[in-house]
């Protein structure tokens, strides 16, 4: 496939994903949250009893769909390639910090785009921080940062994460008493939608869509393919929001900083939260969406990162790190600062390749 065709497919996939994300709000998801990998993993962690924040406990079918969409597409295209063994503990810790940064901002990079598409100008500060974090990560990449190579694994090992996802689906359908579900109307965890994740997972697998990769590749290689997907999601969701606002009698686009759904107006911490997320995602090699897609393709490294995201969500809600519409917490601010320092240390320790080669 030529680069021109790849870019065309990326734009098409981004537009479709943006429209799907907007329609999910129409079908019941919270506004500006048709998709949010961080928030949905947080909800799932709560459902599994990893935290006790009652308003955000639900096994999100979108997460299950993303993994299965990637898994089935990878099998169909013979791209299921189990690999792993690259600094698993470091990846777990970085995954936790990605979640801490995301829950400071109240959204992952995917939701950041959707917040912009819904008119939330607070997301502009998040985007600025996200870009700055990526630039810091690119600095270390240029200096030789690497978590070292991964190794080929057995098909059985690569299938563990999809099987675990299947088990979570069984829990969602069976709804046993030990699984926690937000009561209808009590919070975003209850406002669930159909499994659109299958389509998004398949499209993301085929196009290698990554929110971090767009800015990273543009800076490193002057390559625009991934950032076209980023922009296309924004355009697709924005246009769909405007159409829905004009045809349904409900506003899906509200331009401004104040009174935005599931958001706060503290610009500094919106910036720093997404800076941590962007920086840590570069060190991991992909955004939370990309980590889920790679997990479906058989990457145990990405599966470990997803476990880190789940653990980070538990920490955020068990220890008061997560922000709310009222703003960030003191504990959350401290955690973001610790995360930024830890990310710099991890990046520095693992930046040695070019230095040793000199």
Where are these regions (language model features)?
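Membrane-interfacial helix-loop segments of redox and metal-homeostasis proteins
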Residues: 1-358
């Amino acid at each position: 496939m030529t680069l021109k065709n790849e870019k065309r497919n990326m734009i098409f996939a981004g537009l479709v994903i943006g429209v799907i994300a907007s329609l999910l709000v129409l079908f019941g998801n919270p506004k500006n949250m048709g998709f949010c990998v961080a928030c949905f993993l947080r909800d799932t962690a709560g459902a599994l009893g990893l935290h006790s924040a009652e308003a955000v406990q639900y096994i999100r079918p979108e997460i299950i769909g993303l993994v299965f969409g990637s898994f089935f597409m990878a099998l169909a295209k013979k791209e299921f390639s189990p690999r792993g063994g690259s600094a698993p503990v470091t990846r777990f810790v970085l995954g936790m910090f990605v979640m801490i940064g995301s829950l400071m901002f109240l959204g992952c990079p995917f939701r950041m785009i959707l917040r912009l598409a819904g008119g939330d100008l607070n997301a502009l500060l998040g985007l600025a921080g996200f870009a700055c974090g990526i630039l810091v990560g690119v600095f270390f990449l240029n200096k030789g940062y690497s978590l070292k190579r991964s190794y080929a694994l057995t098909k059985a090992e690569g299938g563990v994460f999809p099987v675990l996802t299947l088990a979570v689906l069984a829990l969602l359908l069976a709804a046993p008493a030990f699984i926690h579900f937000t009561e209808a109307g009590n919070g975003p965890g209850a406002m669930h939608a159909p499994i659109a994740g299958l389509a998004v997972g398949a499209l993301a697998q085929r196009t290698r869509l990554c929110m971090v990769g767009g800015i990273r590749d543009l800076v490193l290689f002057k390559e625009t393919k991934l950032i076209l997907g980023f922009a296309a999601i924004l355009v697709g969701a924005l246009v769909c929001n405007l159409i829905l606002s004009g045809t349904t009698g409900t506003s899906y686009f509200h331009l401004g900083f104040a009174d935005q759904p599931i958001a706060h107006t503290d610009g500094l911490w919106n910036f720093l939260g997404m800076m941590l997320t962007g920086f840590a995602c570069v060190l991991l090699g992909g955004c939370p969406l990309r980590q889920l897609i790679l997990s479906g393709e058989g990457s145990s490294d990405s599966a470990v990162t997803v476990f880190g995201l789940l653990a980070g969500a538990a920490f955020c809600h068990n220890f008061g790190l997560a922000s709310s519409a009222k703003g960030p917490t003191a504990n959350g601010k401290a955690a973001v600062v610790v995360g930024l320092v830890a990310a710099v240390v991890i990046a520095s320790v693992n930046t040695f390749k070019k230095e040793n080669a000199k």
